[in-house]
A protein has these predicted regions:
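Helix N-cap at the start of a conserved alpha-helix in ABC-type nucleotide-binding domains
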Residues: 128-130
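Conserved ABC transporter NBD signature motif
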Residues: 20-31, 35-36, 175
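H-loop/switch region of ABC-family ATPase nucleotide-binding domains
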Residues: 152-153
């Protein structure tokens, strides 16, 4: 792969860097993993929640793992603040769509009050409305000074939601762009040219 998920895994200290350092708020993720994780919230592509628990119970459980213990009222407010309908708060997560599960993930991140959010393909498999709702939640978090690193193949969402865009290939950052200085059409062209050069390199190897 390009190395997007590997990059996130380095920040989470799931794997060790072969060289160099990974730092979060000035802390070395390898040398100070517990301190680093206090500043991080992570939402994987397939968020693992307990299907037999309600959205509220999942939020309270996972927030508790992060040292936060929202009461029922606070948990309900958090879930509704990310767009989960009030009648869904007390339903089992096994009845949730992927979009609803992602909203619980954002609520957990908000409950943790982490100032950095890592996302791995968060809009994969979402319908257009759910994807748009998720993008709006990210905008709100960014306005509240949360730094967001999102690994995605969705060029439209990258352009719409990001301030900076990086294109990776074979574990290397090939392009680093200011999202305000490139159009979606230009971004798509650059991405395709980058991927095409990779294919040619493989053929000519």
């Amino acid at each position: 792969g390009a190395g997007k998920t590997t990059t996130i895994n380095l920040f989470m200290n799931f794997i060790q860097p072969s060289s160099g350092h990974v730092k979060v708020n000035g802390l070395d993720a390898s040398a100070q993993p517990q301190d680093t994780k206090k500043h991080l919230a992570y939402i994987p592509e397939n968020l693992s929640l307990y299907g037999n628990l309600t959205g509220l119970e999942n939020l309270q459980f996972f927030a508790g793992l992060g040292g936060e213990k929202p009461d029922n009222s606070s948990a309900e407010n958090l879930l509704q603040s990310v767009g989960l309908q009030s009648d869904a708060v007390h339903k089992r997560v096994s009845q949730y769509s992927k979009g609803m599960r992602q909203k619980v993930g954002i609520a957990i991140a908000k409950a943790k009050q982490a100032d950095n959010l890592l996302l791995d393909e968060p809009t994969s498999g979402l319908d257009p409305k759910a994807s748009n709702d998720f993008a709006q939640l990210l905008q709100e978090m960014r306005q509240n000074n949360v730094a967001i690193l999102m690994a995605t193949h969705d060029l439209f969402r990258a352009k719409e939601s990001g301030t900076h865009i990086g294109i990776m290939k074979a574990g290397k950052l090939i392009h680093s762009l200011d999202s305000d200085e490139i159009t979606l059409t230009e971004l798509e062209h650059l991405y395709l040219e980058t991927m095409k050069s990779e294919s040619h390199a493989e053929v000519n190897h």
